């Protein structure tokens, strides 16, 4: 296939310009501009040709109007909202669900953990599938899976089986796993690296995390207020909202986003090793608090999961031709530090989320709707945090914002660990939630921007997968760890507050370690920038 582009050069310091038509024989190649030449880039492939001109924001051929771009941004924000609402709409009615299925108290953790477990385990491959087969296609697949299994989750009431409900929620999580990473991949393709608009869009997407948490919990609580037996409509309503999002995505997402122009292939061996290892490892940590660590199958599964995960990393580093994890990431210590800090921060928040709702329902005896309504703080301060990120990330840099986010996660967990049961909501509780908003809304855009800008264009879906894998998987895994601590401290089950606080102390420890890592990364980043600045001044 032959492609034509214009090369723009200056002639001997004059303002005159020469337009040269240059024919380039290219197949799945990108013409990259040089230091001295301003080149209009053409991406050519056997399937489609994309032209990227000098627009400071994105390729203007993606959107026919500003209104359509706004709809695209709204679709991206809804994806994040659904991701968080998918967790809290069930969390705030967990006592209703437990009573409906006659579940034991210990099984409540599984009613909540199966969704983020599946989402976190499958997100890792969903971005790569989007990079290979089309980001929009995989996004649509994710929406369809969520719609189908949301309906089945509601119908599970008639099975009278909590195991069936837990399985349905897991498949619902698989669908969610295909939504957000591919949305983030589309943002990475549509908007230019480092552009202000890209930072704005990612910040707005991040703002929908606390907003989604509030709407999910509030509407879940509202539906069961009059009649708890109507809880299936919580999931039917979620399916309807997902269907409307599907229609928006179908219409607003451009069809001309390049697909696999670099000829990537799927690493099925690495994918299988990763998924099996992640699921088994997570299962062990969530099942052990229920049955006890002395059960032989728990120890056996733990050993098997570790073997699979070690095999995955060995295979990816030495044998995979096209590794699932880009080597540009696995060999970059700073990217690993970022992902580890995000893991620890969101892991502590996963513990906070479950035990905060348990605290309100079981100790303060709030109704499900009031428990969900307390998340309104997240909407207000989450929006403030999003605007702060959007307009400060260029000045402060994502490294500093990531550090602030870990401090917010840590402060929120510390405040929860000393929160009195009888104290008014408007004191420590209100302040705690306001601070936690900055943990969520600073960490997501900061880490997403660092990885999106740091990885090649062909890995944009994978960049979205990495951040969201860490966020979702850490929430489920660390909840299991928190459950282990809780049951060790409150073995009799008669001292809920003592057990809850013990789990939250673990969250404090995780977030504190995240602060240490993020501060280390920030200082190294500042030192490298200072050193480069000195090198430039010496060269000048």
Swiss-Prot record:
It is found in: Membrane. InterPro entries: MFS, MFS_dom, MFS_trans_sf. Belongs to the major facilitator superfamily. Residues 83-108, 153-169, 225-232, 294-295, 356-372, 420-429, 483-502 are extracellular. Keywords: Membrane, Transmembrane, Transmembrane helix, Transport. PROSITE patterns: MFS. One of its GO terms (molecular function) is borate efflux transmembrane transporter activity. It is a multi-pass membrane protein. Pfam families: MFS_1. This is Uncharacterized transporter YMR279C. The chain crosses the membrane at residues 62-82, 109-129, 132-152, 170-190, 204-224, 233-253, 273-293, 296-316, 335-355, 373-393, 399-419, 430-450, 462-482, 503-523. Residues 1-61, 130-131, 191-203, 254-272, 317-334, 394-398, 451-461, 524-540 are cytoplasmic. One of its GO terms (cellular component) is membrane. GO terms for biological process: borate transmembrane transport. It comes from the Eukaryota.
């Amino acid at each position: 296939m032959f492609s034509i582009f214009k090369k723009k050069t200056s002639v001997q310091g004059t303002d005159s310009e020469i337009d040269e038509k240059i024919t380039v024989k290219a197949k799945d190649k990108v013409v990259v501009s040089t230091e001295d030449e301003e080149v209009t880039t053409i991406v050519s492939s056997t399937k489609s040709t994309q032209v990227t001109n000098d627009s400071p924001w994105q390729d203007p051929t993606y959107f026919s109007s500003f209104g359509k771009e706004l709809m695209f941004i709204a679709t991206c924000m809804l994806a994040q909202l659904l991701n968080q609402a998918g967790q809290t709409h069930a969390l705030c009615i967990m006592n209703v669900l437990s009573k409906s299925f006659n579940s034991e108290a210990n099984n409540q953790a599984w009613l909540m953990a199966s969704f983020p477990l599946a989402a976190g385990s499958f997100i890792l491959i969903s971005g790569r599938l989007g990079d290979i087969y089309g980001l929009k296609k995989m996004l649509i697949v994710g929406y369809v899976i969520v719609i189908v299994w949301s309906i089945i989750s509601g119908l599970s009431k008639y099975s009278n089986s909590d195991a069936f409900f837990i399985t349905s929620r897991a498949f619902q999580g698989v669908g969610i796993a295909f939504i957000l990473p591919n949305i983030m991949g589309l943002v990475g393709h549509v908007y230019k690296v480092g552009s202000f608009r890209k930072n704005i869009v990612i910040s707005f997407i991040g703002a929908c995390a606390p907003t989604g948490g509030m709407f999910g919990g509030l509407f879940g609580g509202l539906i069961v207020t009059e009649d708890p037996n109507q809880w299936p409509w919580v999931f039917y309503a979620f399916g309807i909202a997902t269907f409307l999002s599907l229609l928006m995505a179908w219409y607003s997402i451009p069809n001309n986003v390049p697909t696999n122009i670099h000829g990537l292939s799927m690493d099925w061996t690495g994918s299988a090793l990763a998924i099996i290892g992640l699921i088994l490892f997570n299962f062990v940590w969530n099942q052990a608090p229920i049955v006890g660590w002395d059960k032989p199958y728990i120890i056996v599964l733990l050993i098997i999961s570790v073997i699979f995960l070690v095999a995955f990393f060995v295979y990816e580093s030495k044998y995979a031709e096209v590794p699932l994890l880009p080597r540009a990431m696995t060999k970059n210590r700073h990217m690993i530090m970022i992902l580890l800090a995000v893991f620890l921060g969101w892991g502590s928040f996963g513990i906070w989320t479950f035990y905060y709702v348990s605290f309100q329902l079981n100790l303060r005896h709030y109704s499900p709707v009031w428990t969900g309504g307390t998340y309104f703080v997240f909407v207000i301060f989450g929006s403030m945090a999003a605007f702060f990120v959007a307009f400060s990330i260029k000045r402060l840099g994502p490294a500093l914002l990531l550090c602030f986010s870990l401090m917010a996660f840590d402060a929120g967990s510390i405040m929860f660990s000393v929160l009195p049961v009888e104290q008014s909501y408007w004191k420590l509780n209100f302040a705690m939630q306001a601070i936690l908003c900055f943990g969520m809304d600073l960490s997501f855009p900061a880490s997403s921007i660092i990885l999106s800008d740091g990885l090649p264009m062909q890995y944009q879906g994978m960049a979205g997968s990495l951040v969201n894998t860490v966020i979702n998987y850490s929430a489920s895994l660390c909840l299991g760890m928190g459950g282990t601590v809780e049951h060790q401290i409150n073995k009799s089950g008669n001292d809920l507050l003592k057990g809850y606080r013990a789990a939250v102390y673990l969250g404090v420890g995780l977030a504190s370690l995240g602060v240490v890592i993020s501060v280390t990364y920030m200082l190294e980043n500042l030192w490298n920038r200072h050193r480069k600045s000195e090198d430039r001044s010496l060269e000048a």
